[in-house]
Amino acid sequence: LDRLPYLSADTKTLQVSSFDRTGGDFDITTGNQNGSGGCLASGGVGCVIAEDRGAGEIDSIWFTRDNGNVTRMGAIRVDLDGHTVVDAPLQSLVDGGLGAPFVWPLVANAAQSPAGVYVKVPMPYRQSMRISVASNLQYYHVDYRQFSNVEGVRTFSPSDPALDVITTLRAAGTIDPKPPAPSAAHHNRGVELAAGATATIAESTGSGSISSLRLRLPNPADQALNRLRLRIEFDDRTTVDSPLGEFFGAGLGASDVRSLMFATIRQPDGSFSLSDWWPMPFARAARVSLVNATADPVGGIDADVVTVPDPQWAPALASGRVGYFTAYSHAGPTILGQDWLFADEQGHGKFVGVSHTIRGSRTKTSFSD
C-alpha cells in the first residue's frame, strides 16, 4: 500500500453489468434482465456473466435479488486458465462457507452488505477467465482488469488463505495498513480557528511523503465536518481541497466510518477522531491547512500529521512514475436527464475512489437508489 502512488501504463479496468443492452427503459414486469436474463452466453454451470482472454484479474463480483438472498441462483463457478477454482452454491460462498480466503470482508452476504452480496477476493489469471451462475440471474456487476502481459502474474489458487491480508482488512479504520516507517516525524498542534481563518497544521520540506493525518474534533462535530475544509499543497500546488466530512467519508454528518485508508470514529468522551493513511509524496515541500468557512470560531481541534523523508519521491515524481495525491470536492443540485460529473482529469494517473453524499430534494434523507 505504500506503493500506491506509483502509476502503471499497462492495465485496463473493465466492468460487465446487468444494464439493458437494448437501450430500453426499465420494465417493472420483467426487471432489468436484458431480454435474456442477463446472460452473455450459455456455459459453465449455466449462464456466463463474464469472460476474458489474456492476462488479467477478477477484482469484484456483486449480485442482488430477493433483498440479497441469492439462494435461488444456485451455484457459481469461476474458471481461470482452464481450471475451476470456485464451484459452490453462491449463497454458501458469500456466507463464508468455503473458508479463507473466501471470508468476510473479502466476501459478504446481505446482512453484511445491505441488499446485495459480493466477492472481492482478487483472482489473477494468465490466459483466460469465465464466471457463470446456474439460474435466476437479475442484477450483477463484475469488475476486472486486463494486463498487457503475463510477467509476474500467477494464477489464483484457493489453497492460499491469505490470512495476513484478511487480518489487515478486518482492522480497517483502526490502524495504518502501510508498513511502518522508522524515520517518520510527527507534527502535533492544537488548532483554534477564528471565523473565516486558515491555519497551517503541518509543513515539511525536501523529498518525502505525508504518511498519515489525524484530527480530533470536539463534540458536536457536525458543523466542523461540513464547514471546515482540508487543503494540502504539494510543491506549491493545491491538490487537496475538501470539506472534512467528505474527505473522511462522513459527508452526511458525525457517524462512525471505517475504511482501509481512512476513518471517522466517535471516541468515549464524545469527540470524533478523523484518520487518513493515504501515502502522499512530494518532491520539495508540503503544507497542510484547515480553513474555517463558518461565521463562528471553531476551537478545540487537535492535529497530528506524520511525514516521512525519502529521496526516492523527487525523481519518481519528476519522471512521471509517481502521481500527486488529489482530492477535490464539488456539490450542487442534479439536473433531470443530465449526468453528474464527479471528475474530469487529464493526463496519466490512478483513480482510487469516490466519497459522495446524496440528499433528497424534498426529504433530505430520501434518495432511493
Regions found by a protein language model. Name each.
Residues L1-D369:
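Beta-strand-centric surfaces of beta-sandwich/beta-rich domains
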